[in-house]
Amino acid sequence: MAIALVTGGSRGIGRATALLLAQEGYTVAVNYQQNLHAAQEVMNLITQAGGKAFVLQADISDENQVVAMFTAIDQHDEPLAALVNNAGILFTQCTVENLTAERINRVLSTNVTGYFLCCREAVKRMALKNGGSGGAIVNVSSVASRLGSPGEYVDYAASKGAIDTLTTGLSLEVAAQGIRVNCVRPGFIYTEMHASGGEPGRVDRVKSNIPMQRGGQAEEVAQAIVWLLSDKASYVTGSFIDLAGGK
C-alpha cells in the first residue's frame, strides 16, 4: 500500500496509532529516539499480526537526523503517504517564573522545530508539483494549547499553540498539492507522558473536573488520527479534533 511515518511511535498515542495504521494496511515506519526495544516491540506486534513495519531512530529536533530518517524511507519501494507528527517532550511541572532558557528551548526544538522539519520533508515527497501522489499529515497538538497549563507547563502548552498555527498555515499552503493537514488535540490521556511531568497519576487527580468524568485512552486518540488520514476524511483539511472529554 503506502508508508505511514509515526514519530514517537514506540509508546503512548504513537504506539496505539502505529498499531491501528497497520491494521488499515499501511506499512508503518515506527520512529523512536532512545528506546529501541519499545519500538521493536511495536514492529513485532505489527508483523506478527500480518502487517508490515520497520523502525527508524531519529531525534526530530536534529535537522540532519530528520533528513536521514526520510532518506531511509525513500529506500523503500512504497511511497510515503501519511505522517503522524507525534513525538514530543514535557518536563517537570514548573511555573513560568522558574523556567530556564535551556528548558524552554529544548521543548521548542522538539515540539515545534521537529514538527516543522518533518512536515517539510513530507511535503517535499508528497506534493504533486514534485511528482508526489499527495498525502495526509496529522499533527498531534494538545488541549493545553488553549487551556494554557498554568502552574504546570506553560512552555509545553505554548509549543502546542505553535503546532495549531503550523497546522492552519501549512494546510493552506499545500491544499492544492494534494496534501491534507489536520490536527488532534488530546488532553487527560492515560500515557507515560504525565510521569515526565513529575505526576504519573495526574489524570486520576483531575478527572473529576473533566465533563465526562474520566481520562482518555491512547486508542481513542489513535482512532481520530487514523480517520483524519483516511479517505473518509478526504474533504477535511485545516481541521482540529479535540479529544479531552469535553474540556
Swiss-Prot record:
The active site is at Y156 (proton acceptor). Substrate binds at S142. InterPro entries: NAD(P)-bd_dom_sf, Sc_DH/Rdtase_CS, SDR_fam. CDD domains: SDR_c. Pfam families: adh_short_C2 (PF13561). NADP(+) binds at residues 4-28. This is Uncharacterized oxidoreductase YgfF. The lineage of its organism: Bacteria, Pseudomonadati, Pseudomonadota, Gammaproteobacteria, Enterobacterales. The gene is ygfF.
